[in-house]
Regions:
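Outer-membrane beta-barrel translocator/receptor signature
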Residues: 139-142, 153-231, 239-243, 294, ...
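Periplasmic plug
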Residues: 75-78, 89-95, 101, 108-150
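Acidic/polar loop-and-plug regions of large Gram-negative outer-membrane beta-barrel proteins
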Residues: 215-219, 232-303, 318-351, 395-420, ...
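Face-selective signature of the C-terminal outer-membrane beta-barrel domain
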Residues: 296-319, 342-459
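Gram-negative outer-membrane beta-barrel transporters
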Residues: 440-442, 563-641, 660-666, 675-678, ...
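Structural signature of Gram-negative outer-membrane beta-barrels, strongest in the C-terminal barrel
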Residues: 238-240, 351, 370-382, 422-541, ...
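Membrane-embedded beta-barrel scaffold of Gram-negative outer-membrane proteins
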Residues: 301-303, 309-315, 319-325, 488, ...
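N-terminal Sec signal peptide and the immediately downstream disordered periplasmic leader
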Residues: 1-84, 90-97
Length: 704
């Protein structure tokens, strides 16, 4: 706690120093004519109170409007995140159309269109390491861009589910601007944050931005507490008329005490469904799951000739995870609480992620029609070292009474825990081409391809080196403008996923091939203030491992060999409506339905709701803003027969009330799970995790 307070104090001092630098020039600026000279800082979407954006590039690296992107896409702008009271990655996932969630503990498993979301991006560069326990704070990001389906062209390896791109905040203001927020909410939740931007020299060619945040919170769950500290700083510089450089660093320290490892027992020993208070968890006061993330990044944009630009981006992330956990197994005797065994566990994990992307953007014209191509190369290195403990107090011990326990014997000290060190790394290289070609005035071809190299290495003798080269990932899309407001599109996109199964000769199987077919109609109204999208899709997986029907073993082992077979097929429909209907009324609506089956025709991943829907609308009346929304999930289940666990369809309602005290100050109340619906946020093998009860958050925000 002392360290976090020191960090926050230093961060606030930095922000104040930035403020002082800008204030020192304020008097002089007022007397001068506001002329940017050769430096031009354009207004961005961050300055608009909008739920939509003019363009995005997550799908292809091309800056395409939402209408010109031949895939189902959506955007969480800063305004939308603020209105919904969303501050973290996990909270945002609950509101993304088509995403289904299954919480295990601090880990949140997410899927879309029937497939696990196994990566995300930051400024277009992929990250795979431990993302599902990091719960990234969104105060460092301007917006979140979502592309549904396969996105291998700009990613490399992954599942054909969804690409989520976090777009960092930039130092895009020549004037002093920013905001300070104070929050207070349920279960002793408090936070303070500041976001300050300013020029750093007289001309404004060098600009800076600092974001700081400190958060403390208890929970509805027994034992659980969390602290969250954020520092983010970025400097943007127009070095010349043709050279732009951005340098930045980010830091997040997320400490969580009293964490669970898995869910509550789902059944009593007599086979009936267990029922516990939502506050009860499988945790102790010494359990913890702490994650510290440190990042540095740089972006260079250089005009080479006329409109031809060179873009170079690099990022480095260091992620340290420290866990001490308690696991429960068994079925509870409903009368005396017996029948449960437990074990403790200590483990650490360190990851380092390097990303480099270099590309050249070449716009040109043919026959008076604009064309654009981008050629580039990318590199990703993900090095992870796992320090796995070996059960400090033995394997399983008997718990006398599950109802009565308050604390288990303390975990052995970290110095006493023997570790098994398991370093491993995944290296990816790729070259890619992407282009937008205007075939006719109203017909555009969006196409590209990527050639990938992927290699896995490990110091663990049980994990052999795997290497796949020349993996080709094509992308083809057509967009036809019916008129000023409507476009139809169709696309074929793909992605690959390496696997570790071997055939009868001892060779690794080829990577799983994920292919996504999509078609739809997109519309925009009121000058782009409202965007709608209706899409249908079909996703197929090929080369999925299946036991060799001959029953032969992999040479030198007792493992059944595998063959490549047809895998899961998913198909469905999605609808999105987002934007500002009038100056006072804004709506955001999305609904998704899919069905996924394996090669035998059986339902695949029954823990994923087949239908999900999200709606939020707000109305401004003078200085008051009223908002309300709901999130719907259809039935999902796991297991069968007597061990089947089912969560029936449910709806979670939310609301927002805001009052604009003056032009600079706003007071906002957000209430989640308004009617205090009890539901399972996660279900697993004989376990269940309750969702969060009704909660409220009050925010006082001062902007300048």
């Amino acid at each position: 706690m002392i360290k976090s307070k020191k960090m926050f104090a230093i961060s606030v001092f930095t922000a104040l120093a930035l403020y002082a630098n800008a204030y020192a020039d304020e008097t002089k600026e007022k007397s001068e004519k506001n002329s940017l000279g050769s430096v031009e800082v354009l207004a961005t979407e961050s300055q608009e109170e909008s739920y939509t954006v003019a363009s995005m590039n997550t799908s292809t690296k091309l800056d395409l409007s939402l209408r010109d992107t031949p895939q189902s896409v959506s955007v969480f702008t800063k305004q939308k995140l603020d209105d919904l009271g969303i501050t973290s990655y996990d909270e945002m996932l609950k509101r993304v159309t088509g995403v289904t969630l299954n919480r295990w503990d601090e880990r949140l498993n997410s899927s879309a269109r029937g497939f696990v979301i196994d990566y995300f991006k930051i400024d277009g560069m992929p990250s795979y390491s431990s993302y599902n326990a990091r719960d990234i704070d969104l105060s460092m990001y301007e917006r979140v861009e979502v592309v549904r389906g396969a996105n291998g062209l700009t990613t490399g390896a992954g599942n054909p589910s969804m690409s989520i791109n976090l777009v960092r905040k930039r130092a895009d203001s020549k004037e002093l601007k920013g905001d300070v927020s104070l929050k207070a909410g349920s279960w002793n939740s408090y936070s303070a944050s500041a976001d300050v931007s300013s020029k750093l020299n007289e001309s404004g060619s060098v600009r800076g931005r600092v974001v700081v945040k400190h958060e403390d919170a208890d929970s509805y769950m027994d034992n659980y507490k969390r602290t969250n500290d954020i520092f983010y700083g970025v400097i943007d510089a127009d070095l010349t008329d043709s050279t732009y450089l951005s340098l930045g660093a980010a830091y997040q320290k997320l400490d969580r005490d009293g964490v669970r490892w898995g869910g509550l027992p789902a059944f009593y020993s007599d086979g009936t469904r267990a029922n516990f208070d939502r506050a009860k968890t499988v945790s102790d006061d010494w359990t913890h799951w702490n994650v510290t993330t440190k990042s540095v990044f740089a972006n260079l944009e250089q005009t080479l000739y006329k409109d031809i630009d060179l873009n170079v981006a690099y990022s480095y992330d260091k992620i340290d995870s420290d866990t001490a956990l308690l696991y429960f197994a068994g079925a509870v005797n409903r009368f005396d609480g017996s029948g449960i065994e437990y074990m403790d566990w200590k483990a650490d994990e360190q990851s380092e992620v390097h990303n480099l992307d270099v590309n050249v953007d070449i716009p040109f014209e043919i026959g008076g029609l604009s064309q654009q191509i981008i050629v580039g190369a990318s590199y990703n290195l993900d090095k992870t070292t796992k320090y796995n403990g070996v059960y400090p107090n033995g394997y399983y011990s008997t718990l006398p009474n599950f109802y009565a326990y308050k604390t288990i014997l303390p975990l052995a000290s970290a110095s006493d825990v023997p570790y098994i060190v398991e370093p491993e790394e995944i290296e990816q290289k790729g070259i890619y081409f992407t282009g937008k070609f205007s075939l006719l005035e109203d017909l555009k071809l969006i196409t590209g391809a990527r050639v990938s190299y992927w290699e896995y290495t490990s110091d663990n003798p049980a994990n052999e080196t795997r290497k796949f080269t020349n993996e080709i990932t094509p992308y083809v899309g057509l967009v036809y403008d019916l008129n000023e407001n409507h476009s139809v599109y169709t696309s074929y996109t793909s992605i690959f996923q390496p696997q570790d199964d071997k055939d009868s000769s001892g060779s690794y199987l080829n990577p799983i091939d994920g292919k996504s077919y999509e078609a739809g109609i997109k519309s925009e109204f009121l000058g782009g203030k409202i965007n709608t999208s209706l899409s249908i899709f079909r996703i197929e997986q090929d080369n999925v491992a299946q036991d060799d029907p001959s029953g032969v073993f992999v040479p030198g082992t007792t493992t059944i060999a595998s063959i490549e077979a047809e895998g899961v097929t998913s198909k469905g429909v999605e609808l999105d409506i987002t934007g500002q209907v009038t100056d006072n009324f804004t709506i955001d609506f999305g609904i998704s339905n899919f069905e996924a089956k394996d090669a035998n025709g059986d339902k695949y991943d029954t823990k994923a709701s087949r239908t999900t829907a999200n709606i939020f609308a707000k109305y401004v009346i003078n200085n008051f803003t009223i908002g309300a929304g709901a999130n719907y999930k259809s039935k999902y289940y796991t297991g069968s027969g007597l061990t089947k666990i089912t969560q029936d369809a449910y709806t979670i309602a939310n609301m927002m009330l805001a009052y604009k005290i003056n032009k600079n100050t706003n007071l906002q109340l957000n209430i989640d799970n308004l009617f205090d619906k009890e539901y399972y946020e996660g279900i697993g093998n004989n376990s269940m995790v309750y969702g969060t009860p009704r909660s409220a958050m009050l925010t006082l925000k001062y902007s300048f």
